[in-house]
Amino acid sequence: MQDTITNILNKYDLTGKYLDNNALTQITTYLNTALQRLEVVEIIQSQSSKIIKEAAARMYSEQPELLRPGGNSYTTRKYAMCLRDIEYYLRYATYAIIAGNNDILNERVLDGLKDTYNSLNVPIAPTVRSIQIMEEIIHNEISKQDLKIIKKSIISEPFDHMIQNLSEQDI
């Protein structure tokens, strides 16, 4: 896992160049949003159980067939596994928010997910929907906290990255 600064430095080191204005602007943006990213992650961390519970409740109210016999969350064990996965996506999203970089999502969440879900016959649409719902819940929680988030993309980028990558996969 690398943060924004490490990625920039590695890129310039590999080419043997000094940091240019573009690199300095990216680093400045990263540093200027550091406190906001920390505040967002602090809210997510303190509300994680609520976020997961609400995301699951909304997803299952939209797709009740998942809880019926034959559904992918029908047994207690399968339901618990679904909640575990939702927590997993949320936790790694917070890592990406802090890092200001989505690479960890590729390394630890998205790579290999297609094969795993295919082997378990897990449909991807409910997963994508749960990630969308979590993003909505977090935006609502942030607005309740009256935080002055200058860049809404701080919250959206990791969730949108997961949604886009999962939606592109033919599962």
Swiss-Prot record:
Location of this chain's protein in the cell: Plastid, Chloroplast thylakoid membrane
Post-translational modification: Contains one covalently linked bilin chromophore.
InterPro entries cross-referenced by the UniProt entry: Allophycocyanin_b, Globin-like_sf, Phycobilisome_asu/bsu, Phycobilisome_asu/bsu_sf
Keywords: Antenna complex, Bile pigment, Chloroplast, Chromophore, Electron transport, Membrane, Methylation, Photosynthesis, Phycobilisome, Plastid, Thylakoid, Transport
Any one annotated GO CC term: phycobilisome
GO process annotations (BP): photosynthesis
CDD domains: APC_beta (cd12126)
Cited Gene3D superfamilies: Phycocyanins (1.10.490.20)
UniProt topology in membrane: Peripheral membrane protein
Annotated binding of (2R,3E)-phycocyanobilin, by residue: 82
Sites of N4-methylasparagine modification: 72
Secretion signal, residue range per the UniProt entry: none
UniProt superkingdom: Eukaryota
Subunit-level organization: Heterodimer of an alpha and a beta chain.
Family indicated by similarity: Belongs to the phycobiliprotein family.
Job of this protein: Light-harvesting photosynthetic bile pigment-protein from the phycobiliprotein complex. Allophycocyanin has a maximum absorption at approximately 650 nanometers.
Protein name as it appears in the record: Allophycocyanin subunit beta-18
